[in-house]
Amino acid sequence: MKTAVSALALAAGLTLSLPVLAESRTSYGPQLEGFSYPHPLKHYRFESQGKPMQMAYMDVAPTGQANGRTALLLHGKNFCGATWERTIEVLSEAGYRVIAPDQVGFCSSSKPEGYQFSFAQLAHNTQALLQQEGIDQVSVIGHSMGGMLAARLALNYPQLAEQLVLVNPIGLEDWQAEGVPYAHIDQLYQAELKTDFDSIKAYQQKFYYNGNWKPEYDRWVAMLAGMYAGEGKERVAWNQAQTSEMVFTQPVIHEFPRISTPTLLLIGGLDRTAPGANRAPDEVAKRLGNYPELGRQAAAMIPQARLVAFPDLGHSPQVEAPEEFHRALIEGLQR
């Protein structure tokens, strides 16, 4: 009897694990052709650096009483516009039109060869997309790498950004100045080629969720892994290496005192994200990614900044605790 029960339990466990296993091996294509976005994708087609490009984006109308405002959502390096799924719903219900693009080199947008990536270039591309849509002012909300891009957008196009929200942005410290060794693109590319579902999940569990994991996070891991799981993975890996180098060598923090836009910092205090810390000496690595302190320092540097801390949350508070996060976001935007 005990053997039969054990066998049934094992079978049940295997059955439950099959969807995750299958999802972890799914190839969605280098531009996520096979991944289902929460809203229809539009495509902004343009030429940049002599090459034809397309930026995919979601353009979601307000479902609540329209307030005449537009929210621009900028994804992080290990995220896509789709990861903003619940935030899009909340903002739309609050009356916002929501624009959520995938940046060039990421997710469902072009994966160009020979492209010179910079935050200024990505900000320009995004501004041009908004211009095409007839949008002249936005509340800019950037998460992780998207926070660095949001800051650059606010600096380069101050007339465009009426509000700035930085959600656990990376780049609140200058890693190279702190003593993290430089890694060239060829090194980063070789590391990117090893990316798969398990490596993405392990990284996110350690740095984003403080060792915890919920089954609903698997979808976002599978989304990223799906770009590496089939044909085209080399182009994906190369663009990811290029943008890793961009993040490391193009700090925005030194310009924070020049940000004139009213700014809201939403900071999960358990976040320890610090790109390059794995190659830094121990004495350097251990002081990096101290987000409670980094958040306070950033709030002091930006002239019109307000800090809201989530002491028990990590790198992705909008995913980890959506109700708490979105309550703070909406309250902050309405001030």
For the regions a language model picked out, list residue spans one by one.
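Catalytic active-site module of serine/aspartate enzymes centered on a nucleophile-bearing elbow/loop
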Residues: 292-335
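Conserved HGGG/HGGXW glycine-rich cap/lid loop of the alpha/beta-hydrolase fold
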Residues: 49, 53, 58-108, 319, ...
